[in-house]
């Protein structure tokens, strides 16, 4: 029994020891962390306000400017009319707003207890201390070199009034001009005062004051809005409650008097009758519109052919008028062209006309100036006139038979007969060269759309050929009188027949033969050939 009891005790002790052994590492870790997280005093940063630090780090009490700010706040609160019923609620709201501001400004103290009452008591004590300090004279520790000018009492009273808060009288408080100029930058009189002001008015203090003022103004404006909304909601709630009670008592049926019910029924009947009349009027209007549309369609169908005929006539008249106008314009243009041509011809004739007296006088003047006899001047003028004649210049149709890319002109029998008549048989024989292979891409026939005559091309070729032969003959001929010196005696000694032949060059008979060859189908040509019985002379 003793052995069994001892074994059971050992088992029970082991059962209790196992969980304690498991909890040992947790305890050790907690002890280690507790030793590591040693508690120490909170030190403020450069931007954190002094009021949130421990009492050992508190700065000296606020100055007169802080008192003026607090008095200004109290004056603002007094200006707003406060209701006696809701004064307690306003105080509670102000306390809640101050607490919320403190909580927002101090995020590190969210886990700590709410010490708002202690903070308020501290603020009140500081205010009392400042008042006592203001009443009792204090020794001001001045800088070793610089001494502040004492302001008069009137100016101090004006500055410390509640109404003058926020108004800076910097222009009036300027220091007097010194007799001697400043020698160094350290001698500036306002440097030390600026340092003191920076210590008293930090940007955080100013920001907190500004936020307090903004919240106070927002609270004053929100109170009025909330009051109105609350009153409206209360009225609506009362109306709903009364309505619910009446419905529970009287039921959902209408409990209006009989007269009102009768009036409402009559109004409904009148409305129904009015709507029925409107529907009937709409149906009548639809019927009338359908009838009008049918009547208009029939009229249009009847008027369509008449309209088409009128349109056709109208367009025809317009076309005729346009044609007449075009014809008139063409006639006017033709008349203008004819008038211009006549004017040009008259001008040319006037220019060509030579007045004998004026021409002789001009020739004599020129001969006197140039010291040339008048006979030589007349001879020179005659030679120039002969050169300017249109028959002598053959630039109208230029041909280049010697070019390699042109084919030679094939002379027909009629052309040979004409050349023999004109004493050009030798030139025709020289031109008859062996024909080359025709290259069609250089000799494509180009005719206009209106040219349907096949013989026009042949006639043009023949005319060109004759013109070239005439030019060649003139080149091969001996020099004329214009190139050789003129012998007036030989010229006048010649008989008149030679002069006529030189002037005409071709007899009338030869011209008639040329015309017959050009028109072989005419009967008159055959008759004249039979009557004459003459042969063409061959050279």
From Swiss-Prot:
Residues 85-95, 256-268, 333-350, 520-531 have a biased composition (Acidic residues). Residues 76-97, 218-237, 250-308, 325-358, 387-407, 427-456, 517-539 are annotated as: Disordered. Residues 427-437 have a biased composition (Polar residues). It is found in: Secreted. One of its GO terms (cellular component) is secretory granule. Residues 438-450 have a biased composition (Basic and acidic residues). Disruption phenotype: No effect on development of central arteries. Decreased courtship behaviors and spawning success. Normal gross gonadal morphology in males and females but males produce fewer spermatozoa. Reduced levels of gnrh3 in the hypothalamus and telencephalon and reduced levels of oxt and avp in the telencephalon. Reduced levels of lhb, cga, fshb and gnrhr2 in the pituitary. Simultaneous knockout of Scg2a and Scg2b results in greatly reduced ovulation in females. Pfam families: Granin. Keywords: Cleavage on pair of basic residues, Secreted, Signal. Neuroendocrine protein of the granin family that regulates the biogenesis of secretory granules. Required for normal courting behavior and spawning. This is Secretogranin-2a. It comes from Danio rerio (Zebrafish). The lineage of its organism: Eukaryota, Metazoa, Chordata, Craniata, Vertebrata. The gene is Scg2a.
């Amino acid at each position: 029994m003793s052995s069994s009891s001892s074994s059971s005790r050992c088992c029970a002790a082991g059962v209790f020891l196992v969980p304690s052994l498991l909890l040992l590492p947790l305890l050790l870790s907690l002890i280690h962390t507790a030793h590591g997280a040693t508690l120490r005093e909170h030190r403020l940063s450069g931007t954190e306000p002094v009021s949130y630090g421990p009492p050992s780090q508190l700065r000296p009490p606020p100055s007169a400017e802080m008192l003026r700010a607090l008095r200004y706040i109290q004056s603002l609160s007094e200006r707003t009319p406060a209701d006696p019923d809701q004064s307690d609620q306003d105080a509670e709201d102000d306390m809640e707003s101050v607490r919320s501001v403190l909580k927002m400004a101090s995020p590190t103290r969210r886990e700590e207890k709410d010490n708002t009452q202690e903070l308020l008591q501290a603020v009140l004590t500081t205010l009392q201390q400042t008042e006592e300090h203001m009443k009792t004279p204090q020794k001001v520790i001045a800088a070793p070199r610089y001494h502040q000018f004492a302001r008069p009492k009137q100016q101090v009273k004006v500055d410390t009034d509640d109404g003058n808060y926020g108004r800076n009288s910097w222009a009036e408080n300027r220091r007097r001009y010194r007799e001697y100029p400043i020698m160094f930058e350290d001698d500036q009189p306002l440097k030390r005062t600026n340092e003191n002001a920076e210590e008293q008015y930090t940007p955080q203090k100013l920001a907190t004051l500004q936020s307090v003022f903004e919240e106070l103004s927002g609270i004053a404006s929100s109170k009025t809005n909330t009051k109105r909304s609350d009153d409206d909601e209360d009225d609506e709630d009362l109306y709903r409650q009364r309505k619910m009670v009446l419905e529970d008592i009287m039921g959902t049926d209408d409990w209006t008097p009989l007269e009102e019910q009768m009036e409402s029924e009559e109004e409904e009947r009148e409305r129904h009758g009015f709507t029925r009349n409107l529907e009937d009027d709409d149906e009548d209007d639809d019927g009338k519109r359908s009838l009008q549309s049918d009547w208009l369609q029939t009229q249009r169908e009847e008027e369509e052919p008449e309209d088409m005929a009128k349109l056709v006539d109208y367009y025809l008249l317009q076309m005729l008028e346009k044609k007449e106008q075009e014809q008139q314009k063409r006639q006017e243009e033709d008349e203008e062209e004819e008038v211009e041509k006549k004017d040009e011809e008259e001008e040319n004739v006037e220019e060509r006309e030579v007045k004998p007296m004026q021409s002789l006088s001009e020739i004599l003047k020129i001969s006197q100036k140039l010291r040339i006899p008048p006979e030589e001047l007349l001879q020179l003028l005659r030679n120039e006139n002969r050169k300017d004649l249109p028959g002598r210049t053959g630039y109208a149709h230029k041909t280049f038979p010697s070019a390699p890319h042109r084919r030679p002109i094939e002379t027909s029998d009629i052309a040979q007969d004409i050349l023999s008549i004109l004493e050009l048989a030798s030139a025709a024989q020289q031109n008859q060269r062996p024909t080359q292979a025709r290259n069609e891409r250089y000799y494509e026939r180009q005719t206009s759309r209106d040219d349907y005559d096949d013989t026009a091309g042949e006639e043009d070729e023949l005319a060109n050929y004759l013109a070239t032969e005439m030019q060649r003959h003139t080149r091969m001929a001996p020099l004329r009188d214009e190139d050789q010196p003129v012998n007036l005696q030989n010229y006048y000694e010649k008989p008149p027949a030679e002069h006529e032949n030189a002037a005409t060059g071709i007899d009338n008979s030869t011209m008639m033969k040329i015309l017959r060859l050009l028109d072989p189908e005419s009967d008159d040509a055959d008759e004249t050939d039979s009557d004459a019985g003459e042969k063409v002379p061959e050279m």
